[in-house]
Amino acid sequence: MKPNESWTEDWRIGVSPAEEGKIGRELVAIFQRFWEWSDLENRSKSTRQRYSGALHALGSWAVEKAVEDNVPVDAHQLVLEATSGGDGPLIYLDREEWQKELDTVCRKLYKFLAFQC
């Protein structure tokens, strides 16, 4: 459940393996620091699962976005920009409840990232 290196394999799309791996590792590092900062290990199992699912989905979106844009990007800046509007990127178009959970996690992640600057 806690973000880990195996997530980078889930996020690979095969277009630019080197860039996908680089951005994926950066995202995992950010998500791990956020996990610690949020003290999620001391939260309920369901809370950890919600955060894990949202972070995993956000990571997948971020890797795809970075590769599609084909511009060198910093993972911190990419996620900061994606979460700065008060919500996260639209990932769950047909699943409003899942999108709300993602948005909640993204708001907290934004606070964490903004605090890091």
Predicted regions and their residues:
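Charge-rich, intrinsically disordered N-terminal extensions
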Residues: 1-117
